[in-house]
Regions:
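Structured catalytic-domain cores with a bias toward divalent-metal coordination
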Residues: 1-211
Length: 211
């Protein structure tokens, strides 16, 4: 029996409707964006088709509909969503199609190799992962972790200072994830911070010593 749920961190799942055998319509939760992240169980060996329905054409378009340039021959392929069997290693679906109809729909299908799978719009970066990263670097002598204040939902908005002189006048300021569609920029900034504090690059060390 196939089961859907959104009972985990970072999840977003609306109403699920079974249209036919191994064919499901997924309603997205109403919000100002288009975040999608849910779990499916009981899917090993089954080819399942998913129809994601959006509340507006704008949301469907933001999945990356391509413009063929020819209104008589539109290209309805779109940005492929991701799936993961462990919530850590992610893969694109082979194909996805978007249908600008009523309701606005993005459809994709896949034959799964494991019983449990996570499906999302793009690779997630969770708040608990952020806290784990900050905890790992907080005691490094070149790192200072502070809070700029709370977010609208009460979480800390962290700022990480890297260098021997936190009060230096000349600074480089990096911002990541200005909106919810940029979680991979968090990973890029993690890599940059790790490189800065690794102490394995003479040029980086010299730059930090000059700050």
């Amino acid at each position: 029996m196939i089961q859907f749920d959104g009972d985990f961190e970072n999840a977003s799942l609306g109403q699920v409707t079974r249209l036919a055998e191994d064919w499901y319509q997924i309603g997205l939760r109403p919000d100002t964006t288009y975040w999608t992240h849910f779990r499916v169980r009981g899917c090993k060996g089954r080819e399942i088709t998913f129809n994601l329905t959006f509340v507006s054409r704008t949301h469907a378009n933001r999945w990356g509909v391509r413009d063929s340039g020819n209104p008589e021959d539109p290209d309805y392929t779109c940005r492929n969503p991701y799936f993961s069997y462990d919530g850590k290693t992610w893969h694109h679906f082979d194909d996805a199609q978007t249908y600008i109809t009523v309701p606005n729909t993005v459809s994709f299908r896949h034959r799964f190799e494991a019983d449990e799978v996570f499906i999302c719009y793009t690779i997630p970066y969770t708040y608990s992962h952020l806290q784990s990263f900050l905890g790992r670097i907080a005691e490094h002598p070149l790192v200072q972790v502070e809070s700029l204040g709370p977010t609208r939902d009460g979480h800390d908005l962290p700022i990480v200072t890297v260098g021997p002189n936190p009060d230096a006048e000349d600074v480089l300021f990096f911002v990541c994830r200005e909106d919810g569609d940029e979680p991979t920029s968090n990973v890029a900034l993690e890599g940059l911070i790790d490189r800065l504090i690794a102490g394995q690059d003479a040029a980086v060390t010299a730059m930090l010593d000059g700050c």
